[in-house]
């Protein structure tokens, strides 16, 4: 019977019958001698074996008619030289294996060492030698003995003893066999076997690839280099690095295969295609080079594994399918192999790739920044800026900033602009996270994810322009509507699942899923937003579906801090274990429960209690009429599994989509489904569906006022970007095409002129700033920053005053500092991110006492502006005059005393002394003040602004004493070579003290000693930030965040008014002087609310905001402080005038209510306004059970967790409630009464006065603690993204000091009795 190929007259194989060939040769595109290389066309080849005959196809199937390799066939006496002329399927099935010692396969290594498919004249001899070895496949499943033999066989260079005692091979002038047989064994076994052979045969290739991948990751990791300006390219950069990291991990685990490399190449090509299609930036060239470099790194191992894993059977299957498809579609009748080779891209003209290189000068895009690149693509289009948008109204406030509704001035299109405070980001080391959020929002193109159009920066804010979603968020909907109907909850949940599926496919873990971040569109559909805590991991790959991959993916990220919102945090995050995509599915389970029930399943009065319920408690289900459907209950139960391995969704989104709860849901038609709730907008600018949260966050004042302080003008490079969708919308806009892009200095000084600066000063500053920028971007600037100082012309202090281009001196991480400490690359632009630090002085510079230094006078105009309220500070006239002379070029070193206002009630108080020096002139009987009004005088008990203030350059005060230049310590490791100690400095004979830090010892030969640091000096500033009044833990934190470079300002103790004395006996009665700041403009009662909650005893309930972050160290919260450590302030906050409790100071009756700095005793003042405090430090493990204070609980609803306390003014003090003190609470039930809104649920809770606070009021004839419960809606805010504001002002009548009980808090504070106590007179 003739075969199908003979009927079609199409040869199955092309045989080489040319006269130059001694025998016919099989030509297959997959064989080593096939024309796999473009340099080989269809030309005569030399044969592989001089004795091998041609193959005659006699069976219908090509896969059964061809052996897997040139094996010896059990015919004609088992001769290895016989041709399988009579080969059949039956013979192939019953084919016996040869002896174990002969278990070799035909070798690809018979080719020359350089490659694959290279034809050489010696191939005939090599093939003859290969044929004489009677090569066979390896056994089906090798035993342990066989594996040992194979290991010896592949590793040894000696010949193996045959079973008959002979040596096999006797003559082997080439390398050994590469691979075992391709049998139908299990997939995992084949991968292990193949990688074993690969690593044994090619150890250098493996080591070379892993080494290059490590260098690749070290050089191009996103955190170690300047971020890309384009958000899409930034996200692609993240993914390329993640692919390289995953390849390195797979190689170390011996899990790489040719299929893995093939998919990796496909992913890289897709990312490169996205870069070309969705970005117009010149930075695409960087992505192209990055992809090309990674492909070169993996090319050699990929080719080797492809040769090792070549499967003829699979290839013939594909070949047969290609033949049939070609016959059906295109009617190919002749020369089928040539067609297949052409379709596979194996016969390309090699000149095709070289041809574009001839026109390189014409076709290649010019380098970024060149004049040619500016004119590329038509008229130049500048990036958007703040002036392009007009603000309509506030949408919502947040921890780091606010969201506003804006309108584009040219197109009149509405957007939502998110303004994030720069200083808050810098002080919390969150700059990189903002770039991640920008990249995700820019790259994401999904109907259920909010998209971003552009980003830019102003002097004080980073701005992201996003699409405006009109319908508010689901949290507000739950607050107003109560539990949602099942169908409505199903649709919202399903649309969120689709958004999550899209994000997870690109390796994005949201980490902060909650109803607040689910926005409702004008058509009633869901859009996911707020990626401020998100992580970018590895995108989904089919080859990662191996055994154990789920467990590895569930531990993809490991953080040293707990991030998220307490009620939605998964157990693995609480335990500080590795986490991954399953944390989002846990949050989805909590969200669905909240949708259907109306409250979260886990709650508590403290974070510890809440987390204890999360990791241990059972879920409470509603009963009776409010019972949930069984399928919904089952879905929630499976989503809230404690183990991430057992959680629904861990194996993929399809697990959730296939649940019976969505049985009747059309996943493909969700957007076409009519929503039950459609927002009804009264006007275009209607934002009534949003909660502004103005009672919790006060950003309004700071948004309106722009001051002249240089520290607020920090430029974060590469943040401004324009997405592809924005480019398409405004590509034809003349407004964006014509106007030039203002520089950062121009934007800054235009705002300065609006604030009242002179025109001449602005012009001069702009010229200086432009000159500084030009010098900074010169490629030839390869000197150290300190050595470049003299080449800049003006003095550093003048540049720091006028130029707004420089980066302020903050405590950056080590990787941020490391980039600027070493010499710059002369071939790359030099990015000067900070003012150059002067070299360590050889001789100490000691100005005359009572004189203002040049730095003090120059920086005097840089007024502190609060990031929370933005009240404007005034500038004393003498300092303004001095500033004007110095800006004009005069450097008169003569003494100059500022005119301070009299110490009356109407006089202004200087803001702080954190820049120039630390004024310690405290006199107990100085009640009227003097010409040198000190911040620590009895008129103003104010140590300094917040320890996390937005500006390290604060207002100077007149100082008597010497202030040394900054001491810059460079350390190659983590050791600076000095130790410090916290001391108490008492004010006069009172029990009020502040905490200072002195250098306790300096090691010999250490970097600190070389920099000029001396033991016994008082530390005033660390990296430009004042440490006056900071607790020891915060000072250590500032040091640890500095990396390998730290800048200290110190002064000798003998130059201050601090007198060292014996330790006090009654140290428990001491009270800390608390930090406070005064408001600049509005001093009404509502702007002077106290921001500290009250607690009755150390074990009482800790009220915190719902959003907090926990690091490795334990930070003190507002109610946990040592007797010797002041409670610290964590962020810039509105200032409050406060008075001194010194015995001689008169009582100010107009001051705010009395608030004790760390009130823990029943006798301390207790009334005041409450505001959310920050739980910045959470114990690394859950501590022992805390004793709850007696509080009456509501029986009508579930007690919400007080994790966010809005600063609503508390009612005036009144008598204790006559209601019974302790009402036993019944069994906890999560049911909420549907007819009762969240406002009603919280009604009356703010007026409960009994419990612990009530007992205090009745028993001690003291103040009254007002504890209030929180509404359910007030418990939703991010852990990490919150305004950590803590400040207090108190005014206390003269009287005996009250004791402060000790609270056990971990830390290294100076304890009572140590020789670190001092007294200030």
Curated annotation (Swiss-Prot):
PROSITE patterns: AGC_KINASE_CTER (PS51285), PDZ (PS50106), PROTEIN_KINASE_DOM (PS50011), PROTEIN_KINASE_ST (PS00108)
GO molecular function: ATP binding; magnesium ion binding; protein serine kinase activity; protein serine/threonine kinase activity
Subcellular location: Cytoplasm
Catalytic activity: L-seryl-[protein] + ATP = O-phospho-L-seryl-[protein] + ADP + H(+); L-threonyl-[protein] + ATP = O-phospho-L-threonyl-[protein] + ADP + H(+)
Compositionally biased intervals (Low complexity): 59-75, 176-185, 931-958, 1105-1166
Residue numbers of Phosphoserine PTMs: 88, 107, 159, 168, 702, 732, 750, 776, 795, 803, 813-814, 1237, 1289
Binding site for ATP: 395-403, 418
EC number: 2.7.11.1
Chain intervals with Basic residues compositional bias: 1066-1081, 1184-1194
Cited CDD domains: PDZ_MAST3, STKc_MAST
Biased composition (Pro residues): 836-847, 1199-1223
Family from the record: Belongs to the protein kinase superfamily. AGC Ser/Thr protein kinase family.
Subunit text: Interacts with PTEN.
The protein's name: Microtubule-associated serine/threonine-protein kinase 3
Taxonomic source organism: Mus musculus (Mouse)
């Amino acid at each position: 019977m003739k075969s199908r190929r003979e009927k079609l007259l199409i040869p199955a194989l092309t045989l080489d019958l040319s006269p130059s060939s001694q025998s016919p040769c099989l030509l297959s595109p997959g064989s080593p001698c096939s024309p796999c290389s473009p340099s080989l066309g269809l030309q005569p080849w030399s044969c592989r074996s001089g004795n091998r005959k041609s193959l005659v196809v006699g069976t219908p199937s090509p896969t059964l008619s061809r052996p897997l390799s040139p094996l010896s066939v059990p015919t004609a006496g088992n001769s290895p030289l016989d041709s399988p002329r009579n080969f059949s399927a039956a013979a192939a099935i019953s084919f016996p294996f040869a002896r174990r010692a002969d278990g070799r396969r035909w070798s690809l290594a018979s080719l020359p060492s350089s490659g694959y498919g290279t034809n050489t004249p010696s191939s005939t001899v090599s093939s003859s030698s290969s044929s004489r070895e009677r090569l066979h496949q390896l056994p089906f499943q090798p035993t342990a003995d066989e594996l040992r033999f194979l290991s010896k066989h592949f590793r040894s260079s000696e010949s193996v003893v045959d079973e008959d005692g002979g040596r096999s091979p006797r003559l082997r002038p080439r390398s050994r066999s590469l691979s075992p047989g391709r049998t139908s064994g299990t997939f995992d076994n084949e991968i292990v076997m193949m990688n074993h052979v690969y690593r044994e045969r090619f150890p250098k290739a493996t080591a070379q690839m892993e080494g290059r991948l490590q260098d690749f990751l070290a050089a191009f990791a996103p955190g170690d280099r300047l971020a890309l300006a384009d958000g899409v390219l930034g996200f692609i950069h993240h993914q390329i690095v993640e692919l390289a990291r995953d390849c390195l991990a797979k190689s170390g685990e011996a899990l790489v295969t040719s299929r893995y490399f093939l998919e990796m190449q496909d992913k890289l090509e897709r990312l490169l295609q996205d870069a070309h299609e969705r970005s117009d930036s010149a930075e695409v060239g960087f992505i192209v080079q990055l992809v090309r470099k990674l492909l070169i790194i993996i090319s050699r191992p990929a080719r080797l594994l492809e040769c090792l894993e070549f499967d003829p059977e699979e290839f013939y299957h594909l070949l047969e399918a290609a033949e049939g498809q070609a016959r059906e579609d295109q009617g190919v009748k002749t020369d089928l192999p040539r067609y297949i080779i052409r379709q596979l891209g194996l016969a390309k003209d090699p000149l095709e790739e070289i041809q574009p290189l001839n026109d390189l000068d014409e076709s290649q895009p010019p380098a970024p920044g060149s004049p040619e690149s500016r004119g590329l693509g038509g008229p130049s289009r500048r990036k958007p800026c703040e002036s392009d948008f007009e603000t309509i109204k506030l949408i919502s406030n947040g921890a780091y900033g606010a969201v506003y509704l804006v309108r584009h001035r040219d197109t009149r299109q509405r957007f939502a602009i998110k303004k994030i405070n720069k200083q808050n980001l810098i002080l919390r080391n969150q700059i990189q996270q903002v770039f991640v959020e920008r990249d995700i929002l820019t790259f994401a193109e999904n109907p259920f994810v909010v998209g971003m159009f552009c980003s830019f920066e102003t002097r004080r804010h980073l701005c992201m322009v996003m699409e405006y979603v009109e319908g508010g968020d689901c949290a507000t909907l739950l607050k107003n509507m109560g539990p949602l109907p099942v169908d409505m909850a199903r649709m919202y949940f399903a649309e969120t699942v689709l958004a999550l599926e899209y994000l997870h496919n690109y390796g994005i873990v949201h980490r902060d899923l909650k109803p607040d971040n689910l926005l409702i569109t004008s058509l009633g559909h869901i859009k996911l937003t707020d990626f401020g805590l998100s992580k970018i991991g590895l995108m989904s790959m089919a080859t990662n579906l191996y055994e154990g991959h789920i467990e590895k993916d569930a531990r993809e990220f490991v953080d040293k801090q707990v991030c998220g919102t307490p009620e939605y945090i998964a157990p693995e995050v609480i335990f500080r274990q590795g986490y991954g995509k399953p944390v989002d599915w846990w949050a989805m389970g909590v969200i669905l429960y909240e949708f259907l029930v109306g409250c979260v399943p886990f709650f508590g009065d403290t974070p510890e209690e809440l987390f204890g319920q999360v990791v241990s408690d059972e879920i409470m289900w509603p009963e009776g009429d409010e019972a949930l459907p069984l399928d919904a209950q089952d879905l929630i139960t499976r989503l809230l599994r404690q183990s991430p391995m057992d959680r629904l969704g861990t194996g993929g989104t399809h697990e959730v989509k296939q649940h019976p709860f969505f049985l009747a849901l059309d996943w493909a038609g969700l957007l076409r489904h009519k929503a039950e709730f459609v927002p009804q907008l009264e006007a275009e600018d209607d934002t009534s569906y949003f909660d502004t949260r103005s009672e919790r966050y006060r950003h309004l004042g700071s948004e309106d006022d722009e001051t002249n302080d240089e520290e607020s003008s920090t430029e974060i490079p590469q943040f401004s970007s324009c997405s592809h969708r924005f480019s398409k919308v405004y590509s034809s806009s003349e407004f964006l095409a014509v106007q030039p892009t203002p520089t950062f200095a121009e934007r800054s000084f235009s705002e300065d002129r609006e604030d009242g600066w002179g025109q001449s000063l602005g012009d001069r500053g702009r010229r200086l700033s432009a000159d500084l920028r030009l010098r900074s971007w010169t490629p030839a600037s390869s000197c150290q920053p300190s050595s470049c100082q003299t080449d800049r012309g003006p003095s550093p202090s003048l540049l720091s005053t006028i130029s707004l281009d420089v980066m302020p001196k903050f405590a950056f991480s080590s990787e941020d500092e490391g980039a600027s400490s070493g010499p710059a690359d002369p071939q790359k632009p030099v990015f000067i991110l900070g003012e150059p630090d002067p070299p360590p002085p050889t001789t100490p510079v000691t100005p005359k006492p009572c004189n203002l230094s040049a730095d003090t006078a120059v920086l005097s105009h840089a007024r502190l502006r609060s990031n929370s309220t933005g009240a404007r500070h005034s500038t004393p006239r003498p300092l303004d005059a001095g500033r004007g002379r110095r800006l004009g070029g005069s450097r008169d070193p003569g003494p100059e005393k500022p005119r301070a206002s009299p110490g009356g009630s109407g006089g202004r108080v200087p803001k702080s002394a954190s820049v120039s020096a630390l004024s310690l002139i405290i006199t107990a009987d100085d009640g009227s003040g003097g010409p040198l009004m000190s911040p620590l005088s009895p008129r103003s008990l104010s140590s300094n602004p917040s320890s996390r203030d937005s500006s390290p350059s604060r207002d100077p005060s007149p100082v008597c004493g010497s202030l040394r230049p900054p001491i810059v310590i460079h350390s190659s490791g983590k050791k600076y070579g000095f130790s410090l100690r916290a001391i108490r400095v008492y004010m006069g004979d009172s029990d009020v003290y502040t905490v200072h830090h002195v250098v306790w010892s300096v090691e010999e030969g250490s970097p600190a000693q070389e920099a000029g640091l001396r033991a016994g000096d008082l530390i005033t500033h660390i990296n430009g930030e004042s440490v006056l009044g900071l607790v020891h833990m915060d000072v250590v934190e500032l040091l640890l965040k500095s990396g390998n470079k730290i800048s200290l300002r110190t002064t000798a103790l003998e130059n201050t008014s601090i007198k060292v004395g014996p330790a006090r006996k009654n140290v428990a009665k001491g009270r800390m002087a608390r930090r406070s700041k005064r408001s600049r403009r509005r001093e009404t009662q509502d702007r002077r609310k106290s921001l500290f909650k009250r607690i009755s005893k150390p074990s009482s309930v800790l009220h915190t905001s719902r959003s907090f972050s926990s690091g490795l160290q334990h930070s003190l919260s507002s109610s946990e402080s040592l007797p010797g450590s002041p409670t610290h302030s964590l962020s810039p906050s509105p200032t409050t005038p406060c008075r001194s409790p010194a015995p001689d100071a008169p009582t100010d009756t107009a001051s705010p209510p009395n608030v004790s700095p760390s009130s823990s005793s029943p006798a301390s003042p207790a009334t005041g306004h409450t505001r959310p405090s920050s739980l910045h430090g959470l114990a690394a493990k859950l501590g022992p059970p805390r004793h709850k204070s007696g509080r009456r609980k509501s029986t009508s609803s579930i007690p919400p967790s007080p994790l966010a306390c809005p600063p609503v003014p508390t009612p005036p003090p009144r008598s204790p409630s006559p209601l019974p003190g302790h009402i036993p609470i019944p069994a906890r039930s999560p049911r909420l009464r549907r007819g009762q809104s969240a406002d009603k649920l919280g009604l009356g809770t703010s007026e409960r006065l009994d419990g612990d606070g009530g007992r205090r009021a009745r028993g001690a004839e003291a103040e009254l603690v007002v504890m209030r419960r929180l509404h359910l809606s007030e418990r939703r805010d991010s852990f990490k993204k919150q305004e950590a504001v803590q400040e207090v002002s108190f005014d206390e009548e003269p009287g005996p000091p009250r004791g402060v009980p000790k609270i056990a808090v971990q830390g290294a504070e100076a304890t009572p009795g140590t020789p670190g106590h001092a007294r200030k007179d």
